[in-house]
């Protein structure tokens, strides 16, 4: 690896090992150590290039913060998972059936819509990420590892919680237990396109069992949920999102949508992975629609009810380290709005028609990602071609 910034790579490796031993070694041993070191060096050189880290910062606490906060983890992602994050923002609860309806996904909740919140979505996402490490895509049913173990201290750190004091630790454990109980009781039904084919699922329980002993959290997925998970595509999920407040459902739902858009391979190849129409994002948030504003005679206060809270969400995502940059642009050519133009948007319609351009921390540049995707697809096609030729050769020789 080139080192045009005269950075002391050996000291950087030492710091990376120190961070790994503190955060990840208790769970994974040395299994991911070298991958972690490589990612830290690549990430820090990228920060140096963008002047976000000084050369003398390689031994500082800043390295610890940016590394742990922005670490990316591959995780399975589908509508049944995203629905948990959207239950508090756009979920419609039917008290008779005890079902939360979320854009074609139905979650049966034995109590009420308020039982499914950001904390519930976060612990499930955290468990799915651990499951992803154990089970590769399309793992046969009889080989799926259903049980994962999570570290209480690591999860607390990811959430930005200091649980050193015994009372705080008890409260944090109690909250996790409550969220896991909700997941055990909740069932999800819906239909989505997976690997190009429509797939329907009915009454899948999110988890089957859980247990918390000491600092270890055991989560066991049901076989049905596990089979669903290994059929899904993966996204790269930033650790920084766990630090968002459990009380801020809109910011969390926005982050998950931006993360999904950024992780789709075809979007990267088309160059659309870092932009979304504001109108599209608003469909997943609980801000009032145009019709709702008109109905309550509040259309003139659209900035107060929509634009300001929308921008507050963006700022929180920037502050937590998820967003590297964001800006508004006009549709089509993508001409960026100046600060003055952004401040003087005249109407609700004009605002929602804008495009949000954004960059996420921790990801390679577009060209590097596109090259990696193209090479991966070419390798996959090569293997498929070789397999077909081998099969044909065996048939011809019979």
Residue positions per predicted region:
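Charged, alpha-helix-forming regions
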Residues: 1-398
């Amino acid at each position: 690896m080139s080192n045009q910034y005269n950075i002391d790579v050996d000291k950087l490796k030492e710091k990376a090992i120190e961070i790994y031993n503190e955060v990840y070694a208790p769970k994974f041993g040395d299994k991911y150590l070298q991958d972690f070191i490589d990612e830290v060096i690549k990430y820090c050189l990228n920060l140096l290039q963008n002047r976000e880290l000084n050369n003398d910062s390689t031994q500082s606490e800043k390295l610890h913060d940016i590394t742990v906060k922005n670490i990316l983890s591959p995780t399975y992602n589908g509508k049944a998972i995203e629905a948990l994050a959207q239950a508090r923002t756009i979920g419609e609860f039917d008290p008779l059936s005890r079902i939360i309806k979320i854009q074609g996904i139905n979650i049966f909740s034995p109590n009420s819509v308020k039982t499914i919140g950001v904390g519930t979505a976060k612990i499930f996402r955290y468990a799915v990420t651990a499951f992803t490490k154990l089970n590769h895509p399309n793992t046969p049913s009889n080989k799926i590892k259903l049980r994962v173990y999570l570290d209480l201290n690591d999860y607390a750190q990811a959430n930005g919680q200091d649980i050193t004091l015994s009372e705080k630790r008890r409260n944090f454990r109690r909250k996790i237990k409550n969220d896991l109980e909700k997941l055990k009781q909740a069932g999800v039904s819906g239909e989505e396109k997976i690997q190009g084919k429509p797939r329907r699922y009915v009454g899948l329980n999110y988890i089957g069992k859980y247990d918390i002993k000491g600092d270890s959290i055991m989560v066991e997925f049901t076989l049905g949920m596990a089979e669903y998970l290994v059929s899904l595509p993966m996204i790269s999920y930033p650790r920084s999102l766990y630090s968002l407040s459990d009380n801020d459902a809109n910011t969390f739902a926005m982050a998950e949508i931006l993360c999904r858009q950024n992780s789709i391979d075809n979007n990267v190849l088309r160059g659309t992975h870092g932009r979304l129409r504001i109108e599209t994002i608003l469909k997943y948030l609980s801000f009032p629609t145009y019709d709702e504003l008109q109905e309550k005679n509040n259309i003139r206060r659209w900035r107060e009810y929509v634009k300001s809270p929308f921008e507050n969400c963006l700022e929180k995502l920037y502050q937590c380290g998820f967003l590297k940059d964001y800006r508004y642009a006009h549709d089509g050519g993508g001409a960026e709005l100046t600060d003055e133009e952004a401040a003087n948007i005249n109407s609700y319609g004009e605002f929602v028609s804008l495009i949000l351009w954004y960059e996420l921390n921790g990801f390679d540049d577009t060209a590097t990602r596109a090259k990696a995707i193209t090479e991966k697809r070419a390798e996959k096609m090569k293997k498929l071609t070789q397999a077909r030729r081998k099969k044909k050769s065996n048939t011809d020789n019979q």
